[in-house]
């Protein structure tokens, strides 16, 4: 591996969502140029089905988020130059088994509901998982109504198995649909 275009931190979020911890560990073995290689190899060499290491991953995620809030990171916390601190925190939440926290980071800190949807679909391996349904109901639909985006609203209702509302939102004004839904 050579340079930033082969940086294992850039793909960790997606590989952790797929459950490919060993693959990320292998990528870190090849990243001899990265200053955090030794620390990450040691950390990723642990068994994340063990509650102790799940907790360690979650603590690292919260520490990364607090760095963003307070501007300083304690020296014992893993900090890597990913696209963003929040994205790497979401990766550690997935490593620790907390899809809900990873999705909340995507929605609240990153403002990226599409990334949250992608993570929920991959981790839950379904278009009908509880986390995906929650994202659609509590994030996507409000955005669709707020911006008057009929297509987004129709897509969201379709995934919620509300085919009647999915069609109606395309034909009737968004505000009238909102009144009939709630």
Identify what each model region corresponds to:
Residues 1-182:
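Extended alpha-helical solenoid/arm regions of large eukaryotic scaffolding proteins
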